[in-house]
């Protein structure tokens, strides 16, 4: 009887953890999709005026895509490095995975969208003939920084669980 109760709780904990993983990967991917679309739309418009700057536009358009990779990296850490996504997961571990998923997912979502907007403004300026590629890259790093901080927090939380 005790085994079936603990097995039942283990299933609940696994589900809770995987909801966190889904939020982490899903929201970060959605943010990246929006961010690269915002920058990509600006690139199409800017190419009409300055088609020789396509390489710059490509780099700035791809930049918001990194947040989606951070969501996947968070999942990979919990699955492979920390090894907490197992049938023996505890309630504390599941709650930590859920919390990490919400935190990283939301930060990546919003930072990717805002980064896409920064990149789009730089793309528009480059399209008008202004030499602002380097400046745009520097300013686009600021939203990225917060996604990196959220990924680092996810790493630290996972490290604490694995210890």
Predicted regions mapped to residue ranges:
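Membrane-interface alpha-helices at helix entry/exit sites of multi-pass transporters
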Residues: 52-60, 129-140
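Membrane-interfacial loop-to-helix junctions in multi-pass transporters
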Residues: 11-19, 52-55, 89-98, 131
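Membrane-embedded alpha-helical segments of transport systems
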Residues: 63-71, 139-151
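Juxtamembrane boundary at the C-terminal end of a transmembrane helix
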Residues: 152-163
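Helix-adjacent hinge/juxtasegments
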Residues: 62-97
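Short alpha-helical packing/oligomerization segments
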Residues: 21, 93-116
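Single conserved hydrophobic/aromatic residue that forms the stacking wall/gate
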Residues: 1-13
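Juxtamembrane helix-loop transition segments at the membrane interface in multi-pass membrane proteins
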Residues: 33-52, 112-132
